[in-house]
A protein has these predicted regions:
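Short, membrane-interfacial amphipathic segments enriched in basic
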Residues: 1-14
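Helix-loop-helix units of permease transmembrane domains in multi-pass membrane transporters
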Residues: 14, 132-164
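Membrane-interface helix starts
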Residues: 15-33
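Helix-capping/transition residues at the boundaries of transmembrane alpha-helices
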Residues: 20, 134, 145-147, 211, ...
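Central hydrophobic cores of alpha-helical transmembrane segments
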Residues: 30-35, 222-235
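Secretory targeting signals
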Residues: 39-49, 60-61, 76-132, 156-223, ...
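Terminal transmembrane helical anchor/hairpin motif
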Residues: 45-79, 90-107, 230-326
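Transmembrane alpha-helical segments in integral membrane proteins
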Residues: 116-137, 311-331
C-alpha cells in the first residue's frame, strides 16, 4: 500500500465517522451541551475581585488581620482586602470570593474540566461514539472495503483512529471555545487550561478500545454503551481502592492477597483518578484547590507516577484493540 492510498483510505474513514457523528441521535444533545458550557464560560463576571498584577505584594489579607489593621492601611501596604463575588449566568449564580482574579479563573477552570475533559466529558464522549463501530461493521463501507486487499484488523484500527480524530475536533471546539469565551469575559488568559484537551484525547484513547471490542463482539450499540460505562466505573473503583489502601492504617488496610490483586488490576487497567490528578497538576491547581485528601497524599508521596500511569493505560488500550482485531478474524463475525 502506498502512502497516497493510505491517506485516501483514512480520508474515507474520517468522512464516514464525521457523517456518523452528525447523524447520531445524540448530536443535537451534544451541540446543546457544548453551547451550554461555552455560554457558562462567557457569562462569568467578577465583582470587586482585583488582579494580582495590580499589586506589588500579590497576597490578600486574612479577615482577622484586615479587621485589626483596617482597609486603608492595608491598601497603603499594597495588600488588598478582597470581598468579591464570582457571578455566573448573568448573575443568577453568585459565589463569594476572597482571592485574586487569577485564582478565581483557575477555580472556575478546575470545575469546567470536570464537564469537558474529565469524568462527565469523557463518559459523554464514550456514549456518543459507542454506536460508530457496530454501525460501521454492518454498513456499506465495511462491505466495500472488504473487497480490497486489506486486513480486517487494519480496517478496524483505521476506523478507530478516525473516531479519535472526530473526537479531537469536537474537543478543540468545546475546550478551545470555552477558553476563548472565558478569556474574553475575564481578561485572564490561562494557557494551562488547554492541557485539558490533551488529557481528554489521551483518556479517550485509553477507554474507547473497550467500546470497540464490545461493538465488534456484539454488533450492538447498547452493549457498547453499557459496557464502556461499566468499564470506566470498574477502572475508577480499582483506582480508588488502590489509593485508599495506600492511605489506610495497618488496621484499616486490606489483606495481603487483596492488596496484591488490587495492584495487579491497577497496573493492568486505565486509571481515571490518576488522570484527574495529573490534569490538576498540569493546570497548576492541585495545591490551590486540592483533590480529596487520600488522592493528594498519594500524589505527594510519589505513589501516583504520571508517566507510568499514562504509559500502562495506553498499553492496556493496545491490548484491548488487539483482542478486537482477533475477534474480527472469527469466521462467524466476518
Amino acid at each position: 500500500m502506498t502512502g497516497s492510498q493510505f491517506l485516501q483510505i483514512m480520508k474515507c474513514f474520517t468522512g464516514e465517522s464525521l457523517r456518523q457523528a452528525v447523524a447520531s441521535y445524540l448530536f443535537p444533545l451534544l451541540l446543546f451541551y457544548s453551547a451550554l458550557i461555552i455560554t457558562l464560560a462567557a457569562t462569568v463576571r467578577f465583582s470587586n475581585i482585583p488582579e494580582a498584577s495590580s499589586y506589588e505584594i500579590a497576597q490578600r489579607a486574612p479577615k482577622e488581620e484586615a479587621a485589626r489593621v483596617g482597609k486603608e492601611e492595608l491598601e497603603k501596604s499594597g495588600i488588598p482586602l478582597i470581598q468579591g463575588e464570582i457571578r455566573l449566568l448573568f448573575g443568577a449564580v453568585k459565589i463569594p470570593w476572597v482571592k485574586f482574579r487569577e485564582s478565581a479563573v483557575r477555580y472556575f477552570e478546575s470545575m469546567l474540566v470536570f464537564f469537558t475533559s474529565d469524568a462527565v466529558g469523557l463518559i459523554f464522549a464514550l456514549i456518543w461514539t459507542a454506536g460508530f463501530i457496530p454501525e460501521f461493521l454492518q454498513g456499506f463501507w465495511w462491505n466495500m472495503l472488504r473487497l480490497r486487499p486489506l486486513s480486517t484488523g487494519f480496517m478496524l484500527l483505521g476506523k478507530t483512529f478516525s473516531i479519535v480524530i472526530v473526537l479531537s475536533l469536537h474537543g478543540i471546539i468545546l475546550i478551545g471555545g470555552s477558553w476563548i469565551a472565558l478569556g474574553i469575559a475575564t481578561n485572564v488568559w490561562n494557557g494551562l487550561f488547554l492541557w485539558s484537551f490533551a488529557i481528554l484525547v489521551v483518556q479517550f484513547i485509553c477507554f474507547y478500545p473497550a467500546s470497540v471490542f464490545l461493538g465488534t463482539w456484539s454488533r450492538s450499540t447498547m452493549v457498547a454503551i453499557i459496557g464502556s460505562i461499566a468499564f470506566w466505573a470498574i477502572c475508577w473503583m480499582v483506582n480508588h481502592a488502590r489509593i485508599s489502601n495506600l492511605s489506610a492504617t495497618t488496621a484499616e488496610s486490606s489483606s495481603g492477597v487483596a492488596i496484591w490483586l488490587i495492584d495487579i488490576a491497577y497496573w493492568t487497567l486505565p486509571k481515571p483518578i490518576d488522570f484527574s490528578i495529573i490534569l490538576s497538576d498540569l493546570m497548576g491547581t492541585i495545591k490551590e484547590f486540592p483533590p480529596p485528601t487520600a488522592w493528594m497524599n498519594a500524589f505527594e508521596t510519589g505513589n501516583i507516577m504520571p508517566f507510568a500511569s499514562i504509559g500502562t493505560s495506553l498499553i492496556s488500550s493496545v491490548v484491548v484493540l488487539w483482542f478486537s482485531c482477533m475477534e474480527l478474524k472469527d469466521p462467524i463475525k466476518e
